Amino acid sequence: ALIGVEHVEVVDQDSSPQPARDVVLWQPEQSLSEDAAALVARLVDQGCQTICFVQSRTVAEVVAVHAQDQVTTGGVVAAYRSGYLPQERRDLEAGLQSGRVNAVIATNALELGVDISGMDAVVIAGYPGRLSAFWQQAGRAGRSGRRSTVVLMARENPLDQYLVQHPELIFSSSVETTVLHPDNPYVMGPHLAAAAQEAFLQPADEAVYGPSLAQVESMLVRQKVLRQRGERLYWTRLDRAVDAIDLRSMGGHGVDVIDSLTGRVVGVVDQAAADRTVHPGAVYLHQGDQWLVDEYRPQEHCALVHRDLPGFWTMPQSASSVRIVREDARHPFGPGYVATGQVELTSQVLGYLRRDEVTNEVWDSIALTMDSHTMTTSGTWWVIPDGVVDELGLDAVKLAGAA
């Protein structure tokens, strides 16, 4: 059903010619971001075309600035993440291909849908959580006939540290089994939008996409991702779907970050991250420039900013809760059971910290009054009998940490 044919032949061996590749496991001596910046600068100075993958947009901007400051040969280091304007992203991609840009600090925006390969080195600052994602990022390294290097830098969390101590798990284990729930609207929605860019959607498409098609189409129309004309739905934007939306999940309408002095759109923040990224008083980083948020207007999908050098950076403080809506399946597991079903996730930004950009010391904590956001999705939970918890001597905090 996935590809429209009944019989397929499995190809599970890679027989393509590949140059030699060294994989290095790295325990940071300083902080992860400091070591990543220093290593990228060293690689650039040695003439290596480099990609460094990091875990968040903010870290990408910070590492890019610090790496550029340490380059001594005139090489160019740039950040690459979602939220850049399409032309900015295309310029960076072209710069990498031509050699005008020597290194990029990227989020997984560069992991998907971008034809960039043949790098001399890939630095992965923090295990991405899945072997498939690790090897996809590592696969960017390797020019024809030239030896390449992949460096995995471990974070301080238990999973990264365990992998560094047991590297055989990286090299001898097969990638994870793909878990697919195509009817999940938060997964199906972005792919329908991308399909609509290629050709309009119509009722007959239910034979391909299944009975959830109409429900997800209605959601996309409400969010103004698609426009309906009669029984057909169209992608109406000039840019590519891969640039405008997250193909992994549906985040809703993006928030434009606008220069309050000129009216120019500086960048775009996806709706799910906007409260944490462009709340009033936030420092918004974009290609090494610092912008201070003057106003955040979620109903108008925009934030007004001005260029500044405030001497601090901001860290949002938020709270979240999960409520089980419906249990669909249950399986015994140890003394308890594991269940799956529908859950409701509620999150709210409560305030933010201002931290010194040099020493990282906390200046102060500022409270915010922000709306809470609720999303219904699929979830998995593990239930342990109270008697077992009491016998182990675990309070609520220790139990959450143990899980």
Predicted regions located by residue number:
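Helicase motor core with emphasis on the C-terminal RecA-like subdomain
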Residues: 1-201, 205-242, 249-252, 262
